[in-house]
Design a protein with these regions (language model features):
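Alpha-helical multipass membrane-protein architecture
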Residues: 1-659
Length: 659
């Protein structure tokens, strides 16, 4: 490894490579470095347990799941520095890779499986157990890893510089800056402190509102009530940093998708269906569209257009990626026949688990999943189990590339949207073959849990592999030990979920679990003969097709339609800062240096925000309530303070890139 003073990512780390140009990672492919050992595996398991428990609690109690990768990277760097371990970069990547299973498995599990407990209040005959939750999460996670590995080279190497990989960028900068030490890590450390303190003040103390909205003035309230027009921006440091790393291009199209939904579709629906109660696919809706708030119209109707857009963008992505899928399967078939290249001829940094093992592992996992469905979920009905495994395996495999693509573009996996589509499709198919009622709901939710975890883990894992590619770790080692992290995280989340149900009860309203509540609301009518919002899904699908025809990134646009407005606008603000700091000088070298400095600052904001998310969760878990948000945030002045703080944060960001 290079000396600490010279330790930095190559100049071509974040841009497309020229013809004949090669990317050379920090750790030379021709040398061997400490990666997998007792230290890294033990710390990885500890991180997986701690962050799985914290993420599960936070996600179920207050409806927010934080990304654990950056926080784990910071802790790994801190521990290795405190113990003065030399050449710890490879070890830290393994710690991060094992530990990061936590957020991915948690997201996959809590988006679907708590819906079983929620529906139990209405259908007492629906039962579940720790083993069912663990099996659904673990099998889904293992499938996600196995299905992603064949696409590693395409996403991290072949497409180098074409995708921003925001979370991977931030985590990599944390690991590199930690390995550097001294003044070279200073910008990231300062930005981490500023971003962390800023987000802690908002999340834990509530000194100013987390969002600035047009409702801050009476005219804005009137526009929201009558015209259903609203503007919202999340003023957090972490989301601003995310926007900077994504860049202006993808941030623009994501925000544009959001504005089309919030400023055209939502007001348009209010005008067209003002006095109508549109409850054909959701009997719980009793309000007319005109009586709803913009947020209610978005949740009840407009977001479904985004789901349709994501699904169609995913299908288009599968079609476009068909050559890659075909070559990956072909390579596996070739190796199974014993015609593969000798593993020793492949560079260490390009060495994956053999396709023979992946193919056999995939078949064995699918077989175990089939047996789990047959005896554990379908009560011995062979037909239902066969149809279930065919649906789960096909959807999980095909949408793996979509999940990885979304993470590579915006750092946000639309897993809840894809899972909702899976649930709807699975429910329609299972009803058609005769599986209805509570038994059908349980089966569809377990199937959804497997798919959701598979896609969540696949999306998260591509981040780990990109980090390894930039730094020069061995993919084969990351891949092998990822399975351990998945099993540990699945066991932890299963235990936490059952504990929270016993303590609070999912049906009591004490646990937010918004995604699981949405799944329960969708699946209940479907399994009882009520239709899905196919028209809205169809509109979203048509929009995605039109966008693709005009060469506009359909997935980024559809993500914008699905993700709330307040989380998309700051992406545009961050992207605009990126454009500004990298273009305001006539000297290209100065622009490049400022851009790199900005990436460090943005990474610090993301890292600080993520770490404070964990601290806030621990405070809430311990019953420590110091926030004044409940009483203060109803006052419009809290939003004025929010805007002023945001302007100061942006000013700090831009000024810091000049130093």
């Amino acid at each position: 490894m290079e000396e600490k003073d010279n330790l930095q990512l190559p100049e071509n780390a974040f841009r497309e490579l020229k013809d004949g140009e090669e990317y050379k990672p920090l750790m030379s492919p021709d040398k061997v470095y400490p990666e997998v050992n007792g230290w890294s595996v033990t710390w990885g398991i500890v991180m997986a347990v701690i962050f799985s428990a914290a993420a599960a609690y936070l996600g179920l109690k207050v409806g927010q799941v934080f990304e654990a990768a950056i926080s784990i990277a910071i802790i790994a760097v801190g521990v290795s520095t405190a113990t003065k371990r030399s050449k710890a970069l490879g070890e830290n990547v393994i710690i991060q890779s094992i530990g990061a299973c936590s957020g991915a498995v948690v997201a996959g599990a809590i988006f679907t499986l708590p819906a079983i407990y929620i529906l139990q209040a209405k259908y007492p005959e629906m039962t579940t157990s720790f083993m069912k939750i663990f099996m659904a999460s673990a099998l889904g996670g293992v499938l996600g890893i196995l299905f992603l590995i064949p696409f590693r080279k395409y996403f991290v190497s072949d497409m180098h510089g074409k995708y921003p990989f925001p979370e991977a960028t931030a985590t990599t900068q944390v690991l590199v800056s930690g390995a550097k030490g001294g003044d070279q890590a200073k910008p990231l450390l300062i930005a981490g402190l500023v971003g962390g303190l800023y987000d802690f003040i908002v999340a834990s103390l509530g000194w100013w509102n987390e969002n600035f909205t047009s409702r801050v003035v009476s005219l804005g309230c009137d526009l929201a009530d009558k015209a259903k027009l609203v503007f919202k921006v999340n003023t957090g440091a972490a989301v601003l940093g995310l926007g900077y790393i994504i860049g202006l291009k993808y941030a623009f199209f994501t925000c544009l998708g959001s504005l089309v939904v919030w400023w055209l579709i939502v007001p348009g629906m209010s005008v067209i269906f003002h006095d109508s109660v549109l409850s054909a696919w959701d009997p719980s809706i009793v309000k007319t569209v005109g009586a709803m708030s913009p947020e209610e119209i978005f949740r009840a109707y407009a977001r479904s257009i985004g789901i349709g857009g994501i699904a169609m963008a995913g299908i288009i992505g599968i079609i476009k990626s068909w050559g890659i899928i075909k070559s990956a399967v072909g390579l596996a078939a070739k190796e199974l026949k014993g015609k593969s290249d000798v593993d020793e001829n492949v560079k260490r940094t390009q060495r994956d688990i053999s396709f023979k093992i992946i193919a056999i592992g995939s078949l064995v996992t699918i077989l175990i999943t089939f047996l789990f469905f047959w005896f554990g979920v379908m009560d011995g009905n062979l037909l239902f189990a066969i149809i279930a495994i065919l649906l789960v395996a096909a959807i999980a495999f095909l949408f793996t590339t979509v999940a990885a693509n979304a993470i590579a573009i915006v750092g946000s996996n639309p897993v809840s949207g894809m899972t909702l589509m899976t649930l709807i499709f699975a429910s329609v198919v299972m009803v058609a073959v005769g599986l209805k009622g509570p038994g059908g709901m349980l089966a569809a939710l377990i199937m959804g849990g497997v798919v959701c975890t598979a896609l969540s883990v696949a999306g998260s894992f591509i981040t780990d592999l990109k980090i390894g590619y930039w730094l020069g770790t061995t993919p084969k080692k990351q891949e092998g030990w990822k399975f351990l992290g998945t099993l540990v995280s699945a066991a932890t989340v299963g235990g936490v979920m059952m504990l929270l149900n016993e303590t609070y009860g999912f049906a009591s309203g004490s646990l937010a679990a918004p995604q699981a509540n949405a799944m329960a609301a969708v699946i209940d009518p479907l399994m009882n003969g009520v239709g899905a919002p196919w028209v809205l899904y169809g509109i979203g699908a048509v929009i995605a097709i039109v966008l693709t025809y005009f060469k506009i990134p359909a997935l980024a646009f559809a993500l914008g339609m699905f993700i709330p407005l307040e989380l998309n606008v700051p992406l545009l603000v961050g992207g605009a800062i990126n454009w500004y700091v990298t273009s305001r000088s006539k000297d290209a070298k100065v622009n490049s240096e400022r851009g790199e400095k900005g990436t460090l600052i943005a990474s610090g904001f993301i890292a600080g925000g993520a770490l404070m998310g964990v601290v806030s969760a621990l405070l809430k878990f311990g019953g420590i309530e110091v926030s004044i948000a409940d009483s203060w945030w109803v006052n419009p002045m809290s939003e004025v303070c929010s805007l002023l703080a945001y302007i100061c944060l942006i000013g700090f960001f831009i000024r810091a890139t000049k130093k």
